[in-house]
């Protein structure tokens, strides 16, 4: 069974759009840009025969094939594509509750686990100050994994950023991810116009 549901109304609407393309075998491709981050966007695009990727999963629907991006599939768990009519005609909607915050486990790559905790535990607290922190990279230094982070919004230039980094973010991440040894801030804190403190 697939992780995504395409309602009958959405199917019929998409089938009508695809028919107008005059391309035999055309389907759709569902994917997420920047999955597992606060910037995640769920997308549907036309997919002509041969445009699907090898890792895509094919879902044969009544009138066309929906290709689910292999990398996005886990983030599309419980997603629903629907079409609702209104006075202006109608609107296609995509609800993907797991697009921004994937479920991770101990076997997930370290960057996915770091992003998970940033999105679920750390950024909600920073948001009260208009700030957020983003994972830039995970680097290995002397066999130790270091998370390279960047502050944004109200955290950039904030006089308390170093305390937040060491006392809040680093402590939380080290408790949750045993193979992580530390964090590093690469933010230019000389820019203070949006700083909270």
Curated annotation (Swiss-Prot):
Keyword flag Kinase: no
Superkingdom of this protein's organism: Bacteria
Cofactor annotation remark: Binds 1 [4Fe-4S] cluster per subunit. The cluster is presumably bound at the interface of two monomers.
Metal-binding among keywords: yes
One annotated GO molecular function: iron ion binding
Pfam families from the UniProt entry: Fe-S_biosyn, NifU
Keywords: 4Fe-4S, Iron, Iron-sulfur, Metal-binding
Residue sites binding [4Fe-4S] cluster per the record: 155, 158
GO terms (BP aspect): iron-sulfur cluster assembly; protein maturation
Entry cofactors: [4Fe-4S] cluster
Function, as annotated: Involved in iron-sulfur cluster biogenesis. Binds a 4Fe-4S cluster, can transfer this cluster to apoproteins, and thereby intervenes in the maturation of Fe/S proteins. Could also act as a scaffold/chaperone for damaged Fe/S proteins.
Protein family: Belongs to the NfuA family.
Subunit structure: Homodimer.
Name this polypeptide is given: Fe/S biogenesis protein NfuA
Gene: nfuA
């Amino acid at each position: 069974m697939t992780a995504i549901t395409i309602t009958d109304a959405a199917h019929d609407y998409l089938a009508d759009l695809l028919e107008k393309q005059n391309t035999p075998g055309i389907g759709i491709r569902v994917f997420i840009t920047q999955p597992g981050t606060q910037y995640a966007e769920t997308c549907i695009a036309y997919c002509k025969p041969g445009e699907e990727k090898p890792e895509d999963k094919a879902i044969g629907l009544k009138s066309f094939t929906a290709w689910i991006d292999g990398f996005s599939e886990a983030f599309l768990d419980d997603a629903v594509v629907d079409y609702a009519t209104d006075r202006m005609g109608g609107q296609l909607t995509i609800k993907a509750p797991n697009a921004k915050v994937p479920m991770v486990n101990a076997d997930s790559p370290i960057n996915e686990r770091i992003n998970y905790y940033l999105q679920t535990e750390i950024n909600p607290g920073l948001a009260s100050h208009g700030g957020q922190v983003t994972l830039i990279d995970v680097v290995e230094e002397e066999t130790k994994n270091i998370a390279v982070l960047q502050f944004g919004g109200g955290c950039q230039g904030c006089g308390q950023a170093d305390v937040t980094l060491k006392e809040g973010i680093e402590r939380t991440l080290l408790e949750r991810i045993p193979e992580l040894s530390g964090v590093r801030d690469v933010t230019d804190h000389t820019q203070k116009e949006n700083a909270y403190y």
